[in-house]
């Protein structure tokens, strides 16, 4: 499913609907909700709680990405609970471009016709190695293997989210485990490196740039993570940030594909002089931010 390549392709209403999808899903999962972790484009809403005009608007999202513990797929009761909950919410399996039904991507439409997409992700190196690919299943539900996504099981925060349940079933509040600034930045760095989607660059820069307590707290969080069990994964992600966003002898940082992706996503691709100048300024801001992050981490 192709995503918009610029910020103006996203709408606040879709983000709010995605929040409803998440809360509705968790409301019906019972004890298994503790094995579900939010990643992806809805996460910045909780990492950066400030809203315009205090901070610039984040793009939002068109889908809900959750990492699930493999135990949910392995445990018969948990599997059927998830399956029944998806069907009760009106979800059905999405199709790829060839018309083949996917076991890890599900979709439904809200009351006003907006298409909502839920993607189930997991980290199963013993099954799929380091490849991004669907995990095998004998049923209708599986997950897409996303290498390193299990770091969110340790590097997460909790937010209380209130939303109107799908189907007109009232307002509910759920505690949502979501990626913290370190795991979110790492997973977005891996995603940008692999698929080169502009929004991944926007997401990671936005959350670092507008971290509630400033860049120093982000640096401190990375320092703690580098002293923990996921140090190797974090270092790999930082190497990607260095390669995609930071200065080196051969190329000025602002000209690299990371800052350019941020600027084109946020400001569009217009070719008049004013827009080109605005993009270059934004590129410099993005590259400077990542340079300061990397310098602070050391």
What is each PLM-predicted segment?
Residues 1-298:
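Compositionally biased terminal segments of proteins
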